[in-house]
């Protein structure tokens, strides 16, 4: 069951980059490209995920962009509300700053910082209950792929979160991002055929979990570049991209947005 009628998303994950002056320049250059070559909001959802201390600054800079560009948090606390939790930022605090979108489950959070299933479920549930839209990341390692376990691993990651997501939240607040771990920041990319095959399996799994399965956007993340964006965008179940390094270059990021906006 294809998701080809879904409005695509392109989200730039800046990770722990860049310094403030470079971030300001990056946003201004991207805004200029949007002004010169406008892409309608209805053709593609666009977001950028800066470091947490830059969220409101970037959001303010984007207010006068020629189209809507969402500001996305890279992470959220597993603890809700407010309280004595040094270093944490809750979903409610993000919402209070008009940050309505968040990444949860990125492989770097899982692998480097120990975000396990229970932690991710808590983060996801808190964000959804606060009214945020969550881009939930799933993906397999190279070892898991080589052992023929890729589909099983990815589908299990989605099934793991099903108990904390309501039918209405699946419909309105969840985006899935498939990021093969072996392709992140390595320059390696799953072939469009391999990526589409996995996205089709994810779509099938989502349709078994929820009646909203055919309407959930599934993004590809794994060394997405301007050079491969058109091919990826042509795949029926690839509904956008979670872009890493290429989003730190305004021209490259714009070309990726353009590729997906023109594909559907």
From Swiss-Prot:
Q: In which pathway does it act?
A: Carbohydrate biosynthesis; gluconeogenesis; Carbohydrate degradation; glycolysis; D-glyceraldehyde 3-phosphate from glycerone phosphate: step 1/1
Question: Where do the annotations place substrate binding?
Answer: 13-15, 185, 223, 244-245
MF GO annotations: triose-phosphate isomerase activity
Name a biological process GO annotation: glycerol catabolic process
Q: Does the keyword Membrane apply?
A: no
Top-level taxon of the source organism: Bacteria
- Residues of the active site are 106, 179
> Which reactions appear under catalytic activity for this entry?
D-glyceraldehyde 3-phosphate = dihydroxyacetone phosphate
Q: What is its EC number?
A: 5.3.1.1
CDD domains listed in its UniProt record: TIM
Identify the GO cellular component terms for this protein: cytosol
| Family from the record | Belongs to the triosephosphate isomerase family.
Role description: Involved in the gluconeogenesis. Catalyzes stereospecifically the conversion of dihydroxyacetone phosphate (DHAP) to D-glyceraldehyde-3-phosphate (G3P).
- Subunit comment for this entry? Homodimer.
**Protein name (database record):** Triosephosphate isomerase
